[in-house]
Amino acid sequence: MAVDPFDSALDLLRRLNPKQTTDHLNAIISIAPDLTEDLLSSVDQPLTVRRCKQTGRDYLLCDYNRDGDSYRSPWSNQFDPPLDEAGSGGVGAGGNEGAGEGAIPSERVRKMEVKANEAFDVYRDLYYEGGVSSVYFWNLDDGFAGVVLLKKSSPQGGNSEGVWDSIHVFEAIERGRSTHYKLTSTVILTLSTSGGNLGEMDLSGNMTRQVEQDLPVENDDSHIANVGRLVEDMELKMRNLLQEVYFGKAKDVVGDLRSIGSLSEGARDREAQRELIGSMRK
């Protein structure tokens, strides 16, 4: 039975350091260029920041606002570098539907996209106290879809560095006075620290979770509130899961493998503990 090259590429990426996902992905694409589009649309990469030439505001790049080497700014709705021709209403010049490939949202969906960017800009400032956020919407036959991007990097130059990238892709299927939302959220986290006593440590990884929910809708503004609530709840759950489960387990493993103090100090502490327990038993 023949092995699917696409599945093999994904399997390989899962086994490599997630901190270098972009480098590994580019290496695989150079070997198998026919997998380029499938891999770029399937593999979550750390987000890249670009400045909008029309507005001077930063925005985030991803596959959902990409057409070749051009990316659409959510602030100006323009591609950089400019495209020869771009479609409207979620349909690109080549007749494609959805995000990317020259597609821009319809007038109604674009208005929601603008409001969503304003709302998540406030959310980013409240929860992240900095960083960059971007929201992109596109049309579907029975509703619309979008992606909410958030990126925060710790200041460089200290003993510790960290980067948080969250990617929230959703579909909103409209059903009269209610809408069915399907949200897929991915967090890509990189943490590194170095010091005289501890040396260097690097923790990198990603986590993906999904949720589906039906919520009431009165008007287009309700969509912004509903998506905001879903993203906020999901980020809180994933952050708590990372902190309590994954980091807690990593702390236990590192503690078992490596002591902050010297081995002789650890041996003396264990001997003192044994003597104390022995005296209590007498």
From Swiss-Prot:
Compartments where found: Cytoplasm, Cytoskeleton, Actin patch; Cytoplasm, Cytoskeleton
A Pfam family assignment: F_actin_cap_B
Top-level division of the source organism's lineage: Eukaryota
Keyword Flavoprotein belongs to the record: no
Annotated spans, Disordered: 73-103
InterPro entries: CapZ_alpha/beta, CapZ_alpha/beta_2, CAPZB, CAPZB_N, F-actin_capping_bsu_CS
Keyword terms: Actin capping, Actin-binding, Cytoplasm, Cytoskeleton
Extent of Gly residues compositional bias: 87-101
Annotated GO biological process: actin cytoskeleton organization; barbed-end actin filament capping; cell morphogenesis
GO CC annotations, alphabetized: actin cortical patch; F-actin capping protein complex
GO molecular function: actin filament binding
Subunit structure: Component of the F-actin capping complex, composed of a heterodimer of an alpha and a beta subunit.
Protein family: Belongs to the F-actin-capping protein beta subunit family.
PANTHER family according to UniProt: F-ACTIN-CAPPING PROTEIN SUBUNIT BETA, F-ACTIN-CAPPING PROTEIN SUBUNIT BETA ISOFORMS 1 AND 2
Function of the molecule: F-actin-capping proteins bind in a Ca(2+)-independent manner to the fast growing ends of actin filaments (barbed end) thereby blocking the exchange of subunits at these ends. Unlike other capping proteins (such as gelsolin and severin), these proteins do not sever actin filaments.
Protein's name according to its UniProt entry: F-actin-capping protein subunit beta
Source organism of this protein record: Gibberella zeae (strain ATCC MYA-4620 / CBS 123657 / FGSC 9075 / NRRL 31084 / PH-1) (Wheat head blight fungus)
Protein encoded by which gene: CAP2
